[in-house]
From Swiss-Prot:
UniProt record, GO biological process: cytoplasmic translation
Residue spans of biased composition, Basic and acidic residues class: 240-250
Organism per entry: Chlamydia caviae (strain ATCC VR-813 / DSM 19441 / 03DC25 / GPIC)
Complexes and interactors: Part of the 50S ribosomal subunit. Forms a bridge to the 30S subunit in the 70S ribosome.
GO cellular component entries: large ribosomal subunit
Region of interest (Disordered), residue spans: 232-284
Pfam family, one: Ribosomal_L2
Name the record gives this protein: Large ribosomal subunit protein uL2
Role, per record: One of the primary rRNA binding proteins. Required for association of the 30S and 50S subunits to form the 70S ribosome, for tRNA binding and peptide bond formation. It has been suggested to have peptidyltransferase activity; this is somewhat controversial. Makes several contacts with the 16S rRNA in the 70S ribosome.
Length: 284
């Protein structure tokens, strides 16, 4: 669900934000009447200094980054390697470092971990990981244990390497076929990809599926997120961009990046990189 605002100010005229109905509130944990968000677990969060888009030399390595509010980084368990131990969902929380929500698990042995929250999971639900786990929302197991047609997310590219694929809000992949040693998945991009059957994945779709419908409403909200303005190359000086300078607006040649490379149509994929795991390309 998402929330639209009355146009009380210019910034709220176009503003569309998530309703955050799935999140657990402090009142649910304490019994008090309050709508405040649950604070992150202290042992599973730490302050991470913003890079501002700079590398170790201080040079801009990623443009349009800088500023923004301070964030606490939440340590997420992408490996889900605590096999055979049941865990109960304590809370579903907001994470400023990613588009999806996160869920705090309390394992039967007392350990707590954060995971990516699947869509529909709520406080009090029980999950488990490992071989023989039930086909239940939030449970984690190897791809070979999943029936055809299963919807999965947080998928490993190599066994025991931790989930790398399908982690953004609202995404899900589908188990399409099985061959000896490998499982074929249909990715959110439309690509069909083969993965080792020993790779782990989590049942369900990633939470916050309305994330793509949100509208920031004003430039200032982008700045709060640490996003700086994008300046056109033709508006720059020749020293700053290949399109810069000149008396008119025409740059006189094909579009190029700030570093002089052709920017439209030039293939950038390494020719030596293997395509044997891609059954069907997302572009075809």
């Amino acid at each position: 669900m998402f929330k639209k605002f009355k146009p009380v100010t210019p910034g709220t005229r176009q503003l569309v934000l998530p309703a955050f109905d799935e999140l657990t509130r402090q009142g649910e944990l304490s019994g008090k009447k309050t709508r405040k968000s649950v604070r992150p677990n202290k042992k599973l969060s730490f302050f991470k200094k913003s890079s501002g888009g700079r590398d170790n030399l201080g040079h801009i390595s990623c443009r349009h980054r800088g500023g923004g509010v301070k964030r606490l980084y939440r340590v997420i368990d992408f490996k889900r390697n605590k096999d055979g131990i049941e865990a109960k969902v304590v809370s579903v929380e907001y994470d400023p470092n990613r588009s999806a929500y996160i869920a705090l698990l309390n394992y039967a042995d007392g350990e707590k971990r954060y995971i990516l929250a699947p869509k529909g999971i709520k406080r009090g639900d029980e999950v488990i990981s490992g071989e023989g786990s039930p086909l239940k929302l939030g449970c984690c197991m190897t791809l070979k244990s999943m029936p055809l047609g299963s919807t999965v997310h947080n998928i490993e590219m190599r066994p025991n390497s931790g989930g790398k694929l399908v982690r953004s809000a609202g995404l899900a992949a589908q188990v399409i076929a099985k061959t000896p040693g490998y499982v074929t998945l249909k990715m959110p991009s439309g690509e069909f990809r083969m993965l080792n059957e020993g790779c782990k994945a989590t049942i369900g779709e990633v939470s916050n599926s309305d994330h793509n419908l949100c509208v920031d409403g004003k430039a200032g909200r982008k700045r709060w997120k640490g996003v700086r303005p994008t300046v056109r190359g033709t508006a720059m000086n020749p020293v700053d961009h290949p399109h810069g300078g000149g008396e008119g607006r025409h740059n006189g040649y094909i579009p190029r990046t700030p570093w002089g490379k052709v920017t439209k149509g030039l293939k950038t994929r390494d020719k030596r990189k293997s395509n044997k795991w891609i059954v069907k390309d997302r572009r075809k």
